[in-house]
Amino acid sequence: IMCTEAKARAFRPSDAELEGDTDAATKYVGVSKKYEATFPNIEMNTVPHLKLVQFIESAIRESEPDIVITHHPADTNNDHLQTSMACQEAIRLFQRQPTVKPVKEFWYMEVPSCSEWAINDAMNLFRPNCYVEVGQNGIQAKCKALSMYRGVMRPYPHPRSVEYITGLAAMRGSQWGCNYAEAFQVVLRRY
């Protein structure tokens, strides 16, 4: 889901600039197909939940993913909660439409500047149980792709700084016995 109304950012790029930033970042990391919708940033709780679910279901129907990765519902950003809850419903699409390929795995991702706050402990905390080795080149590519979004990266010690993101990947890697890794929480696995 891409939000084009970034009202809360200190620097607000135009819609055309944001579209260009998204295109550049997705191309850089090798994404061949992106699914876009215009939902209001920081106000996704004002969008009918069904619209979010249907948008995600449409992407699932078209792309037939094995894995869906979304935000942890305890992230401090309410938009992340709305997205997570909509994904939780959308991955059950195969139960309502038997011709749809079932999703095999459902993961929560770690989002620097959101997941570590975990103020909403009623939703439990982010508990990584899956680590994907990304290597130094992978983490450098992630930082470069993030820097393609105007106004997203910040100076250290902000969690969206190159130093923090690299340090987090090094810590997650050391937890798993490699140099750099991304951590996820697998909440559903179907085989």
Task: List each language-model region with its residue ranges.
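A charged helix-plus-loop insertion that forms the helical arch/lid used to bind
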Residues: S14-E19
